[in-house]
Design a protein with these regions (language model features):
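Long, highly hydrophobic alpha-helical transmembrane signal-anchor segments
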Residues: 1-21
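Hydrophobic residues within alpha-helical transmembrane segments
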Residues: 10-13, 86-90, 109, 116
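Core segments of transmembrane alpha-helices
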Residues: 14, 55-68
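Transmembrane helix-loop junctions in multipass membrane proteins, especially transporters and channels
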Residues: 23-31, 75-76, 104, 127
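Cytosolic, membrane-interface loops and tails of multi-pass inner-membrane proteins
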Residues: 24-51
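Juxtamembrane boundary at the C-terminal end of a transmembrane helix
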Residues: 78, 121-129
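Structural signature of hydrophobic alpha-helical transmembrane segments
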Residues: 78-88
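Interfacial loop-to-transmembrane junctions
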Residues: 93-116
Length: 129
């Protein structure tokens, strides 16, 4: 499996990890598996931010898939795809850490970096380089 596909594997797991972080703690309010979305909607602090990071991670997954598909279909060199994929993963991990830690400006910069990697993959695929 290529590095870019391992990054895809990690990217698929990121929303699940974020959901787990959102469900840890709670100050005595135990997780309600019968109504998980309502329970998560009442979270505050790091739990609410982790839940938001989960939602954004699902969105980023689609963006990465589009970029990866375009790059492979466009015949982009595997090494370049791998570099952009790894950069995307680093940006996304940093994004989640910043989101949960309430570092909003740094989080936005990480989001821009990750999105930029996806856009670059799509553009390179479209150019056929």
């Amino acid at each position: 499996m290529t590095l870019a596909l391992w990054v895809l594997f990690a990217t698929v797991l990121m929303p699940i990890v974020c959901a787990g972080i959102a469900k840890v703690g709670g100050g005595g309010d135990t997780y309600d598996n019968a109504s998980p979305r309502d329970w998560l909607a009442r979270r505050t602090g790091y739990q609410a931010r982790a839940n938001s990071a989960q939602a954004n991670s699902w969105e980023a997954l689609g963006c990465y898939l589009a970029g990866l598909g375009a790059a492979y279909l466009g015949g982009v060199e595997t090494a370049l795809i791998a570099t952009l994929a790894l950069s995307f993963l680093i940006a996304r991990v940093a994004y989640v850490i910043c989101y949960v830690s309430n570092l909003a400006t740094l989080r936005s910069l990480c989001w821009i970096a990750g999105f930029g990697c996806c856009l670059t993959l799509v553009a390179l695929g479209a150019l056929g380089s």
